[in-house]
Design a protein with these regions (language model features):
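Charged, solvent-exposed interaction patches on well-folded alpha/beta domains
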Residues: 1-7, 11-14, 31-40, 48-51, ...
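Acidic-histidine catalytic/liganding microenvironments
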Residues: 56-57
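Membrane-proximal juxtamembrane linkers immediately C-terminal to transmembrane helices
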Residues: 9-12, 22-26
């Protein structure tokens, strides 16, 4: 009977459920967790899995729950994903502000952002949906005579955007705004008002 109970509970993982990830794929998280061969639930404590995940530079936190009776594992991730690549520093800036040498296929900041604006700039980027961030090809600090906190964005779809720090969260509505102009190409001014100057066809 004792041997039967041990054998019953020492079974392999059947299902792994992952949530909270946008940058990392499910398979990458499974590989980082060292669960790719769906090992025994008994030999892989929740704490051990969490520790493996938190060692990864792109993961800031992880919650792991197991249902050993149904051989299921639930993993919830908080990502430390890349925000942009700094052309000046030649480094990638992560969500937590850390700079790493690795080059990512992400938005490139092409010039220096003044230190007095930098922290707020990072905080604003953290609040933009990662799917919108991935639509930005380049960002340039571009003040004029009137507005100091002004930026120019080159979008992957060919549009240009002028925006100020206080309007940055408007970027989360970017797709809806562009759609309202029948997906035509042009310059979107979010630095003063909200209007769209369509390119000559």
């Amino acid at each position: 009977m004792i041997l039967f109970i041990i054998k019953l509970f020492n079974t392999n993982i059947i299902n792994i459920y992952i949530s909270g990830n946008e940058y990392l794929t499910d398979q990458q998280i499974i590989d980082i967790s060292k669960l790719s061969d769906y090992p025994s639930t008994i030999n892989n404590l929740s704490f051990s899995i969490k520790k493996r995940l938190q060692k990864n530079i792109y993961i800031s936190d992880a919650k792991v729950k197991k249902n050993i009776f149904l051989n299921k594992i639930y993993i919830k991730i908080e990502e430390n994903y890349p925000l942009f690549y700094s052309q000046d520093d030649k480094k990638t800036i992560l969500y937590n502000g850390e700079k790493i040498e690795k080059t990512e296929n992400i938005m490139v900041v092409t010039n220096i952002i003044p230190q007095k604006l930098y922290d707020e700039f990072l905080n604003k980027l953290r609040k933009i949906d990662i799917n919108i961030l991935n639509r930005i090809s380049e960002l340039k600090y571009s003040p004029n005579e009137v507005i100091e906190e002004r930026f120019f964005l080159l979008m992957n779809d060919g549009n240009y955007v002028y925006i100020t720090l206080d309007k940055f969260l408007t970027l989360n509505k970017y797709l809806d705004i562009v759609k309202s102009f029948n997906n035509k190409k042009g310059i979107l001014y979010l630095d003063s008002g909200e209007y769209f100057d369509i390119f000559d066809e």
